UniProtKB/Swiss-Prot annotation:
Protein name as catalogued: Translation factor guf1, mitochondrial
Residue span, tr-type G domain: 51-232
Subcellular location: Mitochondrion inner membrane
Disulphide-bridged cysteine pairs: none
Chief location of this protein within or outside the cell: mitochondrion
Topology of this chain in the membrane: Peripheral membrane protein
GO cellular component, one term: mitochondrial inner membrane
PROSITE patterns reported in the protein's UniProt record: G_TR_1, G_TR_2
PANTHER family assigned: TRANSLATION FACTOR GUF1, MITOCHONDRIAL (PTHR43512:SF7), TRANSLATION FACTOR GUF1-RELATED (PTHR43512)
Length: 644
């Protein structure tokens, strides 16, 4: 299969308008001398010329060994000590260590001696999951080259292709590297053939390494120095730097990670944003090594952090250009903001925690600019937020980080996607909050749901189960091809709502962990979408409302009512739980009344005494049912929404 047959969709998505050109890495030169690591990076970097700077990233599909390879490189450059343990130094977040995945791009500057010259190597370790593709995009903006890492046991997978074309579109030098060659299941020859067939990369330029044992990693560092070009910049020009990442420090405020395009950045300098015109005084600059190391200056071509007295996280706009006060430079294009694909409502478990929780959410959003944050309110749960994410894993990681880093837990409603509604008067609007979705079909002319063009890569023996999975999710097959004799590529048009509803886990299950996917927005398509509401004793509970396809309404309603019935405690009167769709009750569960024995103290006497007590009890329960409100504890909502 040729490049055009397999990757034409990716070319159309990412390279539209670019001229086709072959991608070949530069030829290798002489082998290096033994590395002599330098400890004081701040002092050494100040004397390294621009021609000896290399800015590069590692890109790959998830679980292909990026973080482990980074550890071996850090060991060889003297940044960390050699260890037989599993370190994953650049995976700094506890959620990354716990899950074993990279969710946040991390930078590390290193000094390496090659042919008796010192080189400054700036490494960026990027995530491999599709939900964090924006991190890859921002990272590549600071690089001149990248390592395309491919698992020799699995071959090219969906995100391998997507990340390749992100680097290709930026005209970066791409070094193909096969990892895990020490495993008995490795098939390097087959994977090399895939690299030639899919990407038109010269197999002779590929390097075979083992990030676990460190085999051929020194040769890889040499190849980076030989093949990745140095930054093109003017050291004597006015300062010009671009913000590529930011995070919040409790004591220092907003810290930025910048790439110096021209000139130099020193502590004490007065700078301003070319876009917002806000001014800042630089308190400190330095390198990530991988922890912050203070330096006197950041020179042209270098990547480092800056502490600049920025207190408001909203002022740190990724892609923003900065220069010295009194100078004028042309602003860089900036980064295109990705639109959220899944939304949830979030509320504090304890309402008094709202202010501190709001600060924590803002600080996390500063570190991950793909998160959408908007204040929202609920009649049931009070004031909260409307949050948007790039996928279900993105949402899950956000909640974990909120708990790990800020000790906060939130009550999160069922995820929804944005729907496009055409009203009777011809006007259209986007609705992602179930509370804003119309109850009756007569209120609107048409509802359209977002679609995703999904590319799935998996072993060919799982074609049947994968096709059945896609069909059960209302998918429409677009293409079917074979990457090789052993790997199949399916392209399906799927509703975004089904893709976000555990589809990736189901794919992994039916392919025994060997399936992968990549997707892109495919516009909107008309669909039979309705709102499902829940009532307790006739009172609507807005926090439980959801939007879904009509085919799933009855099944979802019955299952939800049964779960809700098991969570709400019994009252002294009968409680009706109902599910309503388009103003019609479609399902019901009843919580029977808790019986109190009012005749317990009647040990004898006239039977009419007992009858009178029972009659009074029935009338009292009738009044309670008519006028009483069921008070639902916050924990009931938490248990219900977490299990759903």
């Amino acid at each position: 299969m040729t490049l055009r047959r397999f990757s034409y969709t990716f070319q159309a998505r990412i390279l539209r308008g670019l001229q086709a050109r072959p991608v070949f890495v530069l030829p290798s030169r002489s082998h290096s001398t033994k590395a002599r690591p330098v400890v004081d990076i701040a002092d050494a970097a100040e004397h390294i010329p621009t021609v000896n700077i290399r800015n590069w990233a590692i890109i790959s599909h998830i679980d292909h060994g990026k973080s482990t390879l980074s550890d071996r490189i850090l060991e060889l450059t003297g940044v960390i000590e050699k260890s037989s343990g599993k370190q994953r130094v650049l995976d700094k977040l506890s959620v990354e260590q716990r899950r074993g995945i990279t969710v946040k791009a991390q930078t590390c500057s290193m000094i390496y001696e090659y042919n008796d010259e010192q080189y400054l190597l700036n490494l960026i370790d990027t995530p491999g999951h599709v939900d964090f593709s924006s991190e890859v995009t921002h990272s590549l903006a600071a690089c001149e080259g990248c390592i395309l890492l491919v698992d020799a046991t699995r071959g090219i997978q969906a995100q391998t292709v997507s990340n390749f074309y992100l680097a290709f579109a930026r005209n970066l030098v791409i070094i193909p590297v096969l990892n895990k060659i020490d495993l008995p299941t490795a098939e390097p020859e087959k994977v090399l053939a895939q690299l030639e067939e899919v990407f038109e990369l010269d197999r002779k330029e590929a390097l075979l390494v083992s990030s676990k044992t460190g085999k051929n990693v020194p040769e890889l560092i040499d190849a980076i120095i030989q093949r990745v070009p140095h930054p093109i910049c003017d050291e004597n020009a006015s300062l010009k730097c671009v913000l590529i990442d930011s995070w919040f420090n409790t004591h220092r405020g907003v810290i930025g990670l910048v790439r110096i395009l021209d000139g130099k950045l020193v502590a004490g300098a007065a700078i301003y944003s070319v876009n917002t015109h806000r001014k800042y005084v630089v308190n400190e600059v330095g390198f990530m090594h991988p922890n912050p190391v203070e330096a006197q200056v950041l020179l042209a071509g270098q990547v480092g952090y800056v502490n600049w007295n920025m207190k408001n996280s909203a002022e740190a706009i990724l892609g923003d250009t900065f220069t010295q006060v009194g100078h004028v430079v042309k602003a860089m294009p900036g980064f295109e903001k990705q639109q959220p694909k899944v939304y949830v409502n979030a509320f504090p478990l304890v309402r008094s925690d709202y202010d501190s929780l709001s600060d924590s959410i803002d600080r996390l959003a500063l570190n991950d600019r793909s998160i959408f944050v908007e204040k929202d309110t609920s009649d049931t749960l009070g004031i909260g937020w409307r949050l948007g994410f790039l996928g279900s894993l993105h949402l899950s990681v956000f909640l974990d980080r909120l708990k790990d880093e800020y000790k906060h837990e939130v009550l999160v409603t069922a995820p929804t996607v944005p729907y496009r509604i055409t009203w009777k008067d011809g006007m259209t609007s986007m609705v992602s909050n179930p509370s804003n979705f119309p109850d009756a079909r007569t209120a609107y002319a048409q509802v359209e749901e977002p679609m995703a063009l999904v590319t799935l890569v998996f072993p060919r023996e799982y074609v049947g189960p994968v096709m059945n999975l896609c069909e059960s999710c209302r998918g429409t097959q677009q293409k079917c091809s074979f990457l090789s004799t052993a790997r199949c590529v399916l392209e399906y048009l799927l509703p975004m709502s089904r893709l976000m509803d555990g589809f990736f886990d189901q794919l992994k299950s039916c392919t025994h962990g060997y399936g992968s996917l990549e997707y892109e927005d495919a516009g909107f398509a008309p669909s039979d979408i309705v709102k499902l509401s829940y009532l307790v004793n006739g009172m609507p509970i807005d926090a439980l409302c959801t939007i879904l396809h009509r085919s799933s309404v009855l099944r979802t309603a019955r299952a939800s009512l049964q779960r809700l019935k098991s969570l709400i405690p019994r009252q002294l009167y009968e409680v009706a739980l109902q599910a309503m769709c388009e103003k019609h009750i479609i399902a019901r569960e009843t919580i029977s009344a808790a019986r109190k024995n009012v005749t317990a103290k009647c040990y004898g006497g006239d039977v009419t005494r007992k009858m009178k007590l029972l009659k009074n009890q029935r009338e009292g329960k009738k009044r309670m049912k008519q006028f009483g409100n069921v008070s639902i504890d916050q924990g009931v909502f938490y248990d219900f929404l977490m299990k759903s």
